[in-house]
Each structure stands twice: as C-alpha cells, then as structure tokens.
C-alpha cells in the first residue's frame, strides 16, 4: 500500500539529522492563506531552510508586500542543501536576511548568503540569536528532532506554524500543550499536505510517489499536519453532530478501565451523550475548544491503555461535549 511504503520513507528520515524533505510551494500557499492577518509588520524566520531553494522562503519573499512583512530570515544547517544546491558545498551553515531595502526586489538566482561560524543547526547559539529577533517561525523542521524543535519555540515564546507527523500529537508534551490551549492543529492534515520533494538518493516508494513536470521527486506520506499557535477562525467552528447515543448504545461500548464510551470515528460522536467519550487522535483536527473539553490521552484510571473487553483500540483521546443537544 502507498501509505505503508511512504511511511517507510518517513522512518528513514528519522535516522537522518538533516531530514531532507522539502515542502511544496502549493502546500505552503494553501495553508498560509488562512493566517495572513498575523504577519503585518512581523519578522518571519524560516530556520530550517536554504533560502536559495526553500519554498517557505520563496513564498514569503514573493508575498513580502502583500503580507506587510518587516523582515524575512532563512537559515540552513550545512547538510540540508546537499543534493539541492548547485553551488559548491559550504563549510558552514548559512543564513540570509531580506528586508527589501530601497524597494529592491529579490532575485532568487542571485542570493548572497552569509555564513555562520558553526553548522547552522537550529539549536546553535547563532541560530537562536536570529530566533530571538524574530516574531513568527514558519518551516518544516526535521522530524527526528521534532520534540527539541518544539521545546525551543515554546521556551522562547515564539509564534509559529510548522509541519509535523500526525503521530507527533501522541507525544505527551505535545498533547499537554494542546490540552492547555497553547497550540493546536492547523487547517490541513493528511492528504491536505500533498507531498514532499526529496533528493536523488531517496528511493521513490508507493503508487503515490512521483516525479513532477519540473523533475522534482515527490513522496506523499499522507500522514502529516500543521501545528501552530496562530489563531484561525476555522478552529472555532462547531463540529456538526448528527448521531445519537440513546437508542444506539450497542454502537458505543464502554471501556474496561475508564467510565467512558468508545467512538471509532469523529463523525460518529453522539450529540446527546453527557459523559466522557474516547475518540481517534485525528479528532484534534476538528477540535473546537468552545465545543469540547479535552480530558485525558490514551490511559485509563489504572494508567494502562484504554481497553474494551481486554483489547486496546488505537490511541484514544478522552473528551466531553460542552454543548449537549437533545
């Protein structure tokens, strides 16, 4: 299956520090259209991006005036550009700052980058200095370093919009941030992130892997999402509920180790149930904090995985409906 095959590629990426997955311009454009109001007079930092090839940098440079940006910064870990840049491999990481002085427009083929003293890792003191000067971080960080990456954004109290694997929301620290309403899912998830450009040395697995008209090698894992702390109107829309619990109790079995019912699909959440419900993790894509309360993740009262007749469904989030209907 295509999903299984491309997941192998994502697993392969976790073994690489550089995680060479480049985001397509169309996916960036599709997501960023919902956040335009946040960028006026802001400094945007893409801290995992070679400015000469990054579509994140390109998007913000092209839309610099439309968004009303103050400054755009991109920085790159030295290995990120291997296989993507036509120039000689740099000895150090590098960065580029763009603020459109004197009305000059950026020529992408003529970007003169500045070198770091070190490798340009996002955790380096040089990269952190740029982070401190920025307002909003937007990028596709290395999957293998996701926890450290998110921790850093939280530590420095930065606004952000980043790409992550769907399974990242099962991390305890990530779920807690979502539960505390400090971060949330963006607009697009799964097939809403259409694919990633990969270098020549990556094998193209699965029926959804392809080479586009520009010769880019693209894989489509269909299991990625956007995480952010930029508010967007869509997350405040109520999830329409059409199913009922009463009269259909057999469709909603109770857990062995928690006083809650199991709901296999988000669309099957009953509108008339007053108690706690266990729902799939992808529910968070539809989560409206005014409509639902997040109770707990995955575990029962015995701190073991939630189970039904001794069998454990895939990770569940325990929730409660704040707007009960009859």
From Swiss-Prot:
Catalytic activity: a 2'-deoxyadenosine in DNA + S-adenosyl-L-methionine = an N(6)-methyl-2'-deoxyadenosine in DNA + S-adenosyl-L-homocysteine + H(+)
Enzyme class of the recorded protein, top EC level: transferase
Superkingdom to which the source organism belongs: Bacteria
Alphabetical keyword list: DNA-binding, Methyltransferase, Plasmid, Restriction system, S-adenosyl-L-methionine, Transferase
Signal peptide boundaries: none
Molecular functions per Gene Ontology: DNA binding; site-specific DNA-methyltransferase (adenine-specific) activity
Annotated family: Belongs to the N(4)/N(6)-methyltransferase family.
Subunit structure: Monomer.
Protein name per Swiss-Prot or TrEMBL: Type II methyltransferase M.EcoRI
Species this chain originates from: Escherichia coli
Gene: ecoRIM
